[in-house]
């Protein structure tokens, strides 16, 4: 994973030679959106020629063949890359570049299948669309002319985006992306376990995840006041508990598994206390997880994350003032301990401190980057 990040950084540095960062939106570790509009005149090149030059430089610098999509809006650029460049277009120089405007999109891709090749249409949406006779984007566009209300009944507010995309429209601009600021910030860690874990072993892994996330909160001077836990069971659970006849779902391979255990617990106030967050997380785990099942994935979300110094410090007088004062002293003591851990980690590296239980869990969180082995 660290090699992947190194190459991603090298490629991004090439973009910066041509474009201002304000005109680049990093979509993922290996995809970006770039607003070419001001640069076509600046470089006196067509959009496709400018992109060719950049792809050649990427190839020369990294020996990686990159793909690109050019479109009259963000959606069409994405589709031009995902469907045309990656699956159809390789030019005489060996470069993969796709181009779409609204009319080309309708001529070339309205009949394209499967429909879940299109951005933001997953298997679930594809199944719902098929149930009303829609198999491609052309079907969806024509259906929307007389049955818009039906689409809103099925997909809610997301119907607007589906209809726009069926016609090749996209209202979101690069400027809107750059100006967007989320009202609520969350921190999420999801771990796919290397093999099916027992209840106890998965519970121990949750402790490791909480420890890692709380340390991150303290490092960034952040607090949270809500915990969301999602636990996905393994398919072998059905073999282990053959009498189970409760709710079912599918894993990423389409195999039947017991429905995920999912719930939320609110904290009394914003904190970054390892003890409190861990205890509440385990309380939630014990409450919602079936102890007889095997577990394959754990996702933990810390919600309503804010800076520690933005929290109102002065509280109303309380009958439990002595208890609260004692709790506050414990928090301060614990925070000092976690900051001492951070100081050691910063000086000697992530692997310099670990708990003995970490050796048993088979998932080395400190050796990973973004959930992948470094």
Question: What residue ranges belong to the model's regions?
Answer:
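Short Gly/Ser/Thr- and Asp/Glu-enriched loop/turn motifs at secondary-structure junctions
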Residues: 27-31, 71-74, 222-226, 293-297
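Short, acidic Gly/Pro/Ser/Thr-rich loop/turn segments
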Residues: 41, 75, 236-238, 307-309
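DNA-contacting surface of Y-family translesion DNA polymerases
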Residues: 127-294, 310
């Amino acid at each position: 994973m660290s090699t992947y990040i190194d190459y991603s950084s090298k490629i991004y540095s090439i973009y910066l030679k041509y474009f201002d960062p304000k005109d680049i939106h990093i979509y993922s570790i290996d995809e970006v959106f770039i607003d070419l509009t001001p640069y076509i005149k600046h470089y006196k090149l067509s959009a496709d020629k400018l992109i060719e030059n950049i792809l050649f430089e990427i190839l020369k610098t990294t020996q990686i063949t990159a793909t690109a999509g050019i479109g009259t809006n963000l959606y069409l650029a994405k589709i031009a890359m995902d469907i045309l460049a990656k699956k159809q277009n390789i030019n005489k120089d060996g470069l993969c570049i796709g181009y779409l405007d609204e009319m080309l999109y309708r001529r070339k891709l309205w009949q394209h299948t499967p429909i879940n090749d299109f951005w933001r249409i997953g298997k679930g949406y594809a199944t719902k669309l098929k149930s009303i006779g829609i198999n491609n984007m052309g079907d969806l566009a024509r259906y929307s002319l007389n049955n818009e209300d039906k689409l809103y009944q099925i997909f809610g507010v997301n119907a607007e985006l589906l209809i726009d995309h069926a016609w090749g429209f996209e209202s979101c601009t690069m400027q809107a992306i750059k100006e967007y600021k989320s009202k609520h910030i969350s921190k999420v860690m999801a771990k796919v376990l290397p093999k099916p874990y027992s209840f106890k072993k998965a519970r121990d892994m949750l402790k490791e995840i909480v420890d890692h996330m709380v340390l991150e909160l303290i490092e960034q001077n952040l607090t949270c006041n809500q915990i969301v836990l999602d636990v996905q069971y393994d398919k072998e659970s059905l073999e282990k508990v053959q009498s189970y006849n409760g709710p079912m779902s599918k894993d990423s391979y389409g195999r039947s598994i017991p429905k995920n255990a999912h719930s939320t617990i609110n904290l009394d106030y914003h904190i970054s206390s390892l003890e409190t967050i861990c205890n509440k997380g385990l309380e939630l785990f014990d409450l919602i997880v079936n102890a007889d099942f095997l577990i394959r994935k754990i996702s933990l979300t810390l919600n309503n994350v804010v800076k520690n110094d933005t929290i109102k410090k002065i509280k109303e007088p309380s009958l439990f003032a002595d208890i609260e004062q004692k709790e506050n002293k414990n928090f301060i003591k614990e925070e000092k301990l976690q900051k001492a851990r951070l100081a050691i980690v910063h000086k000697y590296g992530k692997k310099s401190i670990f708990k003995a239980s970490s050796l048993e869990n088979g998932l080395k969180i400190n050796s990973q980057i973004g959930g992948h082995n470094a």
